[in-house]
Amino acid sequence: MSATDASTADSGAKRKSSEDITHNCNANFGAENGLRKRVKSEEPVASIKDETNPEVPMKIKAEPVENADEPTSTTPAIKIKAEPADNGNSPAAAMVKTEPTNSNAQDAADESTVSSSSIRTSCRFGIRCYRRNPAHRSAEAHPGDQDYRRPNFPAPPLGTPACPFGNACYRRNPVHFQDYSHPADFNSAQNIRNRLRQRRAQRQNDDDSGTDEEDEPFGGDNDRDADYRPGADINEDEDDELEFDSQPISGDDYD
């Protein structure tokens, strides 16, 4: 064999060995990639679900929050603790806070609110009612009662004479409103308030003028005996305000 043939054979052997090495490297690399892909595909995927399962039963335990500084008029916050059921699922704990309410304001609203079923018939004479029968007082509401409603008197029959006081009339007797007619823009409540102001001013002036007579306690008693009227010293201002601060109702019930 010549030297040329020997060198050619060596070159072919080296080329073959390098191709084998390259092939083996590619095979190993492909095997490693396949193994990595297989391992990655076999890894469990953790699914995240925000929604709670409605089928999972939950036990709710209410625990009051202890707070000594809280006033008695406010509703304490309630902590709701969700405990896992028998199936082993453990839902997250939830905190539910109730809005505090003012019990004093609520009680005042409850006292001022009267249900329609408990409203009694209002006495048509209001504060001017002279009846002292307990049965009448319990059967009909009077000024000062929560269910008292100030009546709006109906229009008198046609042909009744006009009230001599006109718009300045401050009468409240229902018989007067049946015997006399009043203008269309007549405001009885406003007239009575004006009358109350005049009465207070007159009483204040009388008190101021009577201070000079305090030095003589018995002076002038004989002069006032003729002007004495029973019940004239009774203060009716508060009763009048009770009546006219009440809610008006239709006067058709007083026909």
From Swiss-Prot:
A single GO cellular-component term on record: nucleus
Annotated Low complexity bias: 1-11
ZnF PBZ-type span: 121-142, 161-182
Bias-annotated ranges (Basic and acidic residues): 12-22, 40-64, 137-150, 221-230
Hydrolase as UniProt keyword: yes
Enzyme Commission number(s) of this protein: 3.1.1.-
Leader peptide range in chain numbering: none
Keywords: Hydrolase, Metal-binding, Repeat, Zinc, Zinc-finger
Region (Disordered): 1-117, 131-168, 195-255
Family statement drawn from the similarity comment of this UniProt entry: Belongs to the APLF family.
PANTHER family: APRATAXIN AND PNK-LIKE FACTOR, APRATAXIN AND PNK-LIKE FACTOR-RELATED
Record function comment: Displays apurinic-apyrimidinic (AP) endonuclease and 3'-5' exonuclease activities in vitro.
Protein name as it appears in the record: Aprataxin and PNK-like factor
Organism expressing this protein natively: Drosophila melanogaster (Fruit fly)
